[in-house]
From Swiss-Prot:
GO terms for cellular component: cytoplasm. GO terms for biological process: L-arginine biosynthetic process; protein complex oligomerization; regulation of arginine biosynthetic process. It is found in: Cytoplasm. The gene is argR. This is Arginine repressor. The keyword Transport does not apply. PANTHER family: ARGININE REPRESSOR. SUPFAM superfamilies: C-terminal domain of arginine repressor, Winged helix' DNA-binding domain.
Length: 156
């Protein structure tokens, strides 16, 4: 059985490390956590934690790609639903473009990718605050646009 106090300590240490914005790989995070006394931590656990807390890779002040928890994003909660992170949705004849809060694009893209072709999504490309969504062959960009709007309950 998990020790809740130890789990809380791990989460605090994990978040503190990401705030340092100096870890460019999951392996580096594993080593840092092991140095802090979490011997049973491994890359798989770090990967799950990065996903759970919405961590993204971005450039730090030294222009190095590092993992971080964007301040604007934090961890989505019931008081900050994902739809509040979507600022604008637009389309042309080929793709749908979604603008999000800074740092939220990869999280929203992951959600859209999980819906897949049955919802009309062939794939996504996400930056920091912009997502390109390509429709599956059986959907037009307009149909996909309308589906995404309804998903995030936006006005047409």
């Amino acid at each position: 059985m998990r020790n809740p106090a130890k789990q809380e300590d791990l989460i605090k240490a994990f978040k503190a490390l990401l705030k340092e914005e100096k870890f460019s790989s999951q392996g580096e995070i594993v080593l840092a956590l092991q140095e802090e006394g979490f011997e049973n931590i491994n890359q798989s656990k770090v990967s799950r934690m990065l996903t759970k807390f919405g961590a993204v890779r971005t450039r730090n002040a030294k222009m190095e790609m590092v993992y971080c928890l964007p301040a604007e994003l934090g961890v989505p909660t019931t008081t900050s639903p994902l739809k509040n992170l979507v600022l604008d949705v637009d389309h042309n004849d080929a793709v749908v473009v979604i603008h999000t809060s800074p740092g939220a694009a990869q999280l929203i893209a992951r959600l859209l990718d999980s819906l897949g072709k049955s919802e009309g999504i062939l794939g996504t490309i996400a930056g920091d605050d912009t997502i390109f969504v390509t429709p599956a062959s059986s959907f037009t960009a307009r149909q996909l646009y309308e589906a995404i709007l309804s998903l995030f309950e936006q006005e047409l």
